[in-house]
Amino acid sequence: RRVLFRSRIEMTDEVFLEELLGAVTVSGYEEEGQAVIRKYMEPLADEVRTDDIGDTVCVLGPDRDFRILMTAHLDEIGLMVTTVNERGRLQVIDRGGIVPATYPGHRVKVMTERGPVYGVVESYRDFFKKEGGLKTSDFLIDIGVDSKEEACELVEPGAPVVLDTGFCKAAGGRFLSRALDDRLGVFIIMEAFKKARKRGCACGVYSAATVGEETTKNGAYWTASRVKPDLAVVVDVTYTSDCIGMNAADSGEVTLGGGPVLCNSPIVSKRLNRMMRECASRIGVKVQTEAASRLSYTDADKIHFAGEGIPTVLVSIPLRYMHHPAEMADEKDVEGCIDLIAEFLVSWGISGRKTGFGEPDKE
């Protein structure tokens, strides 16, 4: 069997990650991913809850007063079937921020109640020369039939569609998959939860795989409003500056393999950022910094405003080729994020007083 992580990640956890990556979780259709989380986390958590909107929350210490919420979004970008033409081709709209030019000629998976139906997005030599650029409305999905009647027996309008690209290893400890944004984040918060539990974390921990981040960010708002945490740790991916088309001047120099990324944004708590850096220094994890002039465009933006306001910190995983058929990440960054967040969790006392949280920041 393939071995992904060469050092501290156990084989059972690698299987967990691969099953997460294999699940289809187009925004609004996250059930496959929820089932994977429940399978692996129910034996380890005090409680596992799935709310009406679909957020799946693993709880450690539900009766403890001081609560830390960790979130990462389970949903992914994709397409939705709208109608079928007379030739049996599926017409679609986007669900989330897809890159249209990456779809033509690719194999896709259409999810139905009877199981997946496979097809290909029609393409031809001059398709990419279309005036004004490609749009989702230009897509026609060929599922191998030649009439509307045949297609409608297999697929109904509203069916979610994803690119049929899976996990594989690259060189140098890197790996590729569809939907590392943000299935990697989900994996990280669950692994940090397990490490913190083993180390005797004294506060209440709520590790939430949220829904809808790619479309509405409603899942994060629901979870934050229900848990009412004292603070929140959001884990998502971020662009690296070390690949084509990216510029370090836009938000900072971020490299694959360079370690977890902390965000300097108006919605991120300065104090929590500093605490994260102190934790990183204690355990020898190198961190990187990115800057945002306003919002972070992650679940942190919704959580920050929930209730009476929730102090929030954003920890990001460097990622190349975000929202493309094959996104690339580095195992060292994943391990660094897990270690950093676990250290952060166990550094808090049961009441939050260990670090003096809640006192005015003197800086």
Task: State each model region's role.
Residues R1-V3:
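Extracellular interaction modules
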Residues F5-E363:
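N-terminal hydrophobic/helix-forming segments and targeting peptides
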